[in-house]
Amino acid sequence: VKTDEGEFVGYNTDGLGFIRSLGVTDQSNKILMLGAGGAARGIIFAFKQLGYKNLSVANRTLENAKKLVDELQFGQAITYLEAEEQLQSFDVVVQTTPLGMKSNSKELPIQLKGIKEYTIVADIVYNPLVTPFLEEAEKYNVRTINGLGMLVHQGALAFSYWNGSYPNTDDMIQRLTEQLGG
């Protein structure tokens, strides 16, 4: 939140922070979002704002995915089973559920068998740096991205809103990776 011409303006930097960490600018990429919570909402909204066209939301509870898609007027809701069946068609898979955090089990939202070799698999969890989901993805020789970049870029975006300049995020990511044991 900052003031702009005497008015308070709020920004959600989650989505844009995630997309900056992803480093993907091809708007024709087909995106699979796993989870339909607050973080997914911010990321989906950012994909929509940036002109992406192909996004599917899979959630444990299909109704929650449908509700999110309807509210944002973007994407399509699918089941986890449909996500697994269509896995070959996605270019980017984004895991936004709390699965994989230190206190949770090794449970995966979907199985990754059959994933394309050049797919990007991201998990917004940053502690641990390598979640069970990313560990599974690495077995298929895909590019994996943990949530640390999202954390850093959303903070950098907030900093830029307040100060007018975007800080060097490479150093931040390196230092945080070292702090988290990576």
Q: What is the predicted function of each stretch?
A:
Residues 1-24, 130:
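Phosphate/diphosphate ligand-binding glycine-rich loop within oxidoreductases
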Residues 2-3, 117-169, 175:
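Rossmann-fold NAD(P)-binding glycine/threonine-rich loop
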Residues 20-24, 45-49, 70, 135, ...:
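Short, well-ordered alpha-helices that flank and scaffold nucleotide-derived cofactor binding pockets
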Residues 22, 28-48:
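Glycine-rich adenosine-cofactor-binding loop
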Residues 27-30, 52, 117-118:
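Phosphate-coordination loops involved in phosphoryl transfer and adenosine-cofactor binding
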Residues 33-34, 57, 123:
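Hydrophobic Val/Ile/Leu positions in short beta-strands of Rossmann-like dinucleotide-binding domains
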Residues 50-72:
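NAD(P)-binding Rossmann-fold cofactor-contacting core
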Residues 76-144:
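Rossmann-like adenosine-cofactor binding region
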